[in-house]
Amino acid sequence: MSRILVDTSIWIDYFEDKDSYTIIDRLVIDNLICTNDLILAELVPFFHLQEKDELVEALMALQKYEIRIDWPQLIHMQISNLKHGINGVGVPDLIILENVLVNDLILFTKDKHFMLMKDVFDFKMFDYKELKRR
């Protein structure tokens, strides 16, 4: 199975209520979760200020996929979004999507922009709801 890039939206929900995403624990144990510097930059400062050092260490220990930004590609992606009526997608989301595409990762998110972009770009999303039904 490909690595699963857990988006900030899922991590925030998980840390607020671990029972809401128990699958995260299993994915960590199975060593399937990965991250990147953008997601870490969104999460780590908040936990650092709360002095949750063990949590910061655990996040930093996850396999990390380097972000190599291809700016012309991001511009092309945003143009494709706009042509398909998908407005308001921020550059950070485009960078995350590019990281997913380049490294053939599975994205675990609840962000509506990614749900919309799924119809435009060929990438895999982790379907936690489907997994819960089994």
Regions found by a protein language model. Give the residues of each.
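Active-site neighborhoods of divalent-metal-dependent phosphate/nucleic-acid chemistry enzymes
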Residues: 65-110
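General small-molecule cofactor/ligand-binding pocket signal
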Residues: 34, 65, 124-126
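A generic structural signal for short hydrophobic patches within well-formed alpha-helices
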Residues: 11-12, 40-43, 114-115
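Structured helix-beta-strand junction loops
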Residues: 29-31, 58-62, 84, 103, ...
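Active-site-proximal, substrate-binding regions of enzyme catalytic domains
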Residues: 38, 44-77
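Short, hinge-like loop/turn segments at secondary-structure boundaries
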Residues: 50-54, 82-83, 124-127
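Short, well-structured N-terminal submotif of metal-dependent ribonuclease cores
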Residues: 1-35, 45-57, 132
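Acidic, PIN/NYN-like endoribonuclease modules and their adjacent C-terminal/linker elements
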Residues: 1-3, 97, 102-134
